[in-house]
Amino acid sequence: MKITVKDCSLERAKIKKAKIKTMSTKLKVTVIASSLAILLFTIVGGFVNVRASSNDGAYRQLSVYSEVLSRIRLEYVEEPNIAGVTDGALHGLLESLDANSSYLSPEEYKHYKTMKTGGKADIGATVSKRFGYAAVVAVIPGGPADKAGVENSDIIESIEGKSTHDISLAEVHALLSGEVGSTVTVAVVRPRRAEPQKIVIARNIVAIPPVGEKMLADNVGYLQVDAFPEGESQEIAGKIRDLQKQGAKKIVLDLRNSASGAESEGVATANLFLDHGTITYLQGQKYPRQAFNADPSKDITKLPVAVLVNRGTAGPAEIVAAAILENARGDIIGDKTFGDGSVQKLIEMPDNSALILSIAKYYSPSGKAIQDAAVTPNVLVADSTEEEAGLPDEDEQAAPSEKPGDKKDEKPKNVQDDQLNKALEVLKNRESKG
């Protein structure tokens, strides 16, 4: 075959064009990888501010990441979506720190801001992550989620068809909030059932129920606290005074399924029972220790107290329980709590993405991070109401559930409250011992 000069020139042009295209792709990958490496090191080395030796370790990890990215680019079965790979890496990086830390892409951050400023209505439930999915820690009694049939410990498999496994907790919260009267559809999973069930929830401004108060037998005053909004500690103080006027000689403080509110209200509530000692303290790597100590002038009762907790006890309620337990002020009865107590910082990035980063944790008086260790009662008693309702154990893998709306019909009536009964027994024994 005869090859002319013109043919050779054309062939060389094609080869040159192909090389340029290849170089362009490599350059694009290199730029993305470099950008991600810089961002990763900023997070690992800058925000965390580790020592030089640790920085060397961070550099080594970035080298490994660069090698992995190179292998993906060169050997993956098809040309990869590098932007998707890096986005997934950033989400995974932040979410591997703790449930409350999140990476929001520019699009996600825009949506997050819109939902946060678009309305204060939500579903009336505290939601965290479990098994990698969004999970209901506790619902507010009488709130939208409760009325729709959502239950404590439900796994939210998806929101509006979007898997919660694929999004950050911040995005979950954004999706669940919105305008008053708007609806959101969630698919929930419960144990020992066939399939996830869809529940439609009408968002609303959630009113926290008032503190429950009543007198029980043997001069026991009973208080039920569903959440810790601003001013809750003052309401609790008033209820304690009312119970004492009614002749209460002992107090049961029920914090089961109390999972939301302001940590400051938890501190103030604990102080009602303590005249000395540390209630809690905040601390982070770059967050100086901030101790919250009991103020003797704010202690209003010396009555024996027993605190009820379960897996739905989180946040401010855990601060109260840990303070009373570790200052030997009273007994904690029930299940191990959820474990949630930290402070987050929103950090906007140059590309309009954002990080939500945990910068400090709340610690019990003895130095246990509440978010990591939770609060273990000194008197462990399984929640008989949850066992009767068929809710999963802490380590039990969830499975799909019954149809929504069946909650009120299927929930057992007159369930014996083993935890409350044990609290009454503990208080009686303490009284007999003088």
Question: What annotation goes with each model-predicted range?
Answer:
Residues G88, N100-A138:
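PDZ/PDZ-like peptide-tail recognition elements
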Residues F47-Q61, Y65-I82, A135-A138, P144-N152, ...:
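Cleft-lining beta-strand/loop regions that shape enzyme active-site pockets
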Residues Y109, A207, P229, I279, ...:
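Active-site/binding-pocket entry motifs
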